[in-house]
Amino acid sequence: MNGLPRVGLGVDVHPIEPGRPCWLVGLLFPSADGCAGHSDGDVAAHALCDAVLSAAGLGDIGDVFGVGDPRWEGVSGATMLRHVVELITQHGYRVGNASVQVVGNRPKIGWRRYEAQAVLSRLLNAPVSVSATTTDGLGLTGRGEGLAAIATALVVSLRDPLGSQ
């Protein structure tokens, strides 16, 4: 570990499952259908998990929360993010900041952006930016068949002055 900040990228995509609760960016959107998945289907939380794990050099979400492990079945994205923060802390890192962009038509998240940023920032103990975009009708997100998220995270060493709080 050289003490320099490290950057990671995470991507997650899930199909929409009619009738399933919609958890996205750490929030429940009661009027929208949610995503299928082993856990709660929160693509934004999952992409953030991948980005943080990647930045810390600890693999990816599949390594930590494998679909074959019943302990993680139905677990919330919030629980997953808390676990990832514990893991990177054990390995001498903390999150410096993160950003996540949701790709899809629905639910619209703009009106809850600041609430989402507050929830995710609290979970990661760091500033988190939230944004959204569409694919102008192209692909599975454009046809409303699924949602995707792309995230970046910067982690810093707890053992280096740059990582001091």
Curated annotation (Swiss-Prot):
Provide a GO biological process annotation. Answer: isopentenyl diphosphate biosynthetic process, methylerythritol 4-phosphate pathway
Q: Where is this site: Transition state stabilizer?
A: 38, 134
Query: Which cofactors does the annotated protein need, by name?
Result: a divalent metal cation
Q: Which residues bind 4-CDP-2-C-methyl-D-erythritol 2-phosphate?
A: 12-14, 38-39, 60-62, 133-136, 143
Q: Which PANTHER family match?
A: 2-C-METHYL-D-ERYTHRITOL 2,4-CYCLODIPHOSPHATE SYNTHASE, CHLOROPLASTIC (PTHR43181:SF1)
Q: Which domain of life is it from?
A: Bacteria
- The protein's name in its UniProt record: 2-C-methyl-D-erythritol 2,4-cyclodiphosphate synthase
What is the annotated quaternary arrangement, including any partners? Homotrimer.
- Say what the protein does: Involved in the biosynthesis of isopentenyl diphosphate (IPP) and dimethylallyl diphosphate (DMAPP), two major building blocks of isoprenoid compounds. Catalyzes the conversion of 4-diphosphocytidyl-2-C-methyl-D-erythritol 2-phosphate (CDP-ME2P) to 2-C-methyl-D-erythritol 2,4-cyclodiphosphate (ME-CPP) with a corresponding release of cytidine 5-monophosphate (CMP).
Q: Which residues bind a divalent metal cation?
A: 12, 14, 46
Reactions catalysed, semicolon-separated, are: 4-CDP-2-C-methyl-D-erythritol 2-phosphate = 2-C-methyl-D-erythritol 2,4-cyclic diphosphate + CMP
Instruction: Kindly state which keywords UniProt assigns to this record, in alphabetical order.
Output: Isoprene biosynthesis, Lyase, Metal-binding
Presence of keyword Repressor: no
UniProt-recorded Gene Ontology molecular function terms: 2-C-methyl-D-erythritol 2,4-cyclodiphosphate synthase activity; metal ion binding
Q: In which pathway does it act?
A: Isoprenoid biosynthesis; isopentenyl diphosphate biosynthesis via DXP pathway; isopentenyl diphosphate from 1-deoxy-D-xylulose 5-phosphate: step 4/6
- EC no. given is 4.6.1.12
Q: What family does the entry list?
A: Belongs to the IspF family.
Q: How is the cofactor bound?
A: Binds 1 divalent metal cation per subunit.
Per UniProt, the enzyme's principal EC class comes to lyase
Instruction: Name its species.
Output: Mycobacterium marinum (strain ATCC BAA-535 / M)
